[in-house]
């Protein structure tokens, strides 16, 4: 058998140098590692990796070229009680693979064994890693680096955003190419968003359970290869990387940042009954959190949890993030179930991964947004992430809904959430931008469904409506479903307007769910992770143009208010904010805690937000001076000048001092 040269322990993965390929694989507990390469007919040839430096195995294959398909067979103990599940009968993906050929099918040969090893060879059905050679001309690309105070995030799904867009060439709808097409760039600019946050684009798999039901994982939170782009949204697997980078480059030229939703908390290997295709077979004990009985700690709800306190896994995570920043020029990340990142196993602000990110000159300067919880004990960590992390603020989401979709909520609680939840985020030197305010996200009701449904309707997901949260704080305004008489539809419209204004005129970083500005509905499905169909795709031809115009005007208004764009905490008497009652007097202690939902918020001494969240029309006396209503609450050419606002029920209006 041809021997490999020893090669080098870095860089990680498979690296082509023009003459051959250097291969590396981290495994602290392996006893032997075989590199397996495949020709065009699927014939396999195996080579032992001859070198080992620390826990990294390595070797160099002279003459190997880009396009080579490969995998690993890793030898070591089968000791499930100790967390070791080595099985060389199973071909394994390189965790650093930049491209993957094949899908992760629901196939018995991909199972590595539960109590006993499954020694059936899986090479015929296993996905293969592919060597790539990377050259790309970024031209004069530069990161927009939008300040947090001016950032407006737009959360979208690559396919769902553009798949039904009639103005895009049909062949690129639902693809990476579409994201950077002039039609989409113009739309983003017209809307006024500054950052496009994409649901996972790293290659993912559909869970076996979904495959058996004829469904697919649509959202992408089931990662298979963290360094490889999901190929389904490209012209071909070979062109995916360049097509994605073309989109990033086009968005950057328009001043729009690109943020990736990334899943560094579990893998698609799932629980012990899931497929063995990579990490489990490479070094189960190092990559995952293992219980005393050898099973997984399931702090993610997905069957396994990555051990991001292990030095080798910390390095893997940081290399992954650096790859997306340096190779694809992305501007930041939103971390799914991010409390896992801080587990040691208890959550710590000085956890190894946090420390590594903070110390990295590449990663510490991009936008980092945590989903600050997981489902394990002590997993809810809102407000506890260290700088430079921002966090999703579920306090804001719930308070905004409870305020406008009648629930019990004090004026004081609403004001606190409006002021970037300083009680939660004003710590560790963080600024108001650390509070990422949202009304909705991919997970949950859309904004329109918040005003049309009291109950979730997830029957299409195949779990008899058991999945998805029951805590929606929604209000159907008297009739379940989308239709209804004119007065009901008007009340729903008013509620949507009030909610959007609250989101886009509050201190903190607003995040808008793609489609909410259209009136998109998922017909009450609040967990559409497996619905790759018209339920989730945005229907641009049915979009509510008036609502889109309203949303864009709110974003423009936001950018005019220094109190919102300055990204500094409001202090008493600093001119940023005054809290007034319906008579333009400072709110009393009783009004803060027990008063009706009537208030005025004066921002930067020039912009006044008048709020009537009661069920009755109420006169609100504006502060002394001349006030004119501003778009989208009045026309540019015909501003309404008034001293008293007759506030409609569930109404909100913004005025500017003349």
Swiss-Prot record:
This is Glycogen debranching enzyme. The record marks 443 as: Transition state stabilizer. It comes from the Bacteria. The gene is glgX. CDD domains: AmyAc_Glg_debranch (cd11326), E_set_GDE_Isoamylase_N (cd02856). Keywords: Carbohydrate metabolism, Glycogen metabolism, Glycosidase, Hydrolase. Pathway: Glycan degradation; glycogen degradation. GO terms for molecular function: glycogen debranching enzyme activity; hydrolase activity, hydrolyzing O-glycosyl compounds. Belongs to the glycosyl hydrolase 13 family. HAMAP family: GlgX. The lineage of its organism: Bacteria, Pseudomonadati, Pseudomonadota, Gammaproteobacteria, Enterobacterales. The keyword tRNA-binding does not apply. Its EC number is 3.2.1.196. Removes maltotriose and maltotetraose chains that are attached by 1,6-alpha-linkage to the limit dextrin main chain, generating a debranched limit dextrin. The active site is at 336 (nucleophile), 371 (proton donor). It comes from Salmonella typhimurium (strain LT2 / SGSC1412 / ATCC 700720). GO terms for biological process: glycogen catabolic process. It catalyses: Hydrolysis of (1->6)-alpha-D-glucosidic linkages to branches with degrees of polymerization of three or four glucose residues in limit dextrin. Residues 459-484 are annotated as: Disordered. Transmembrane segments: none annotated.
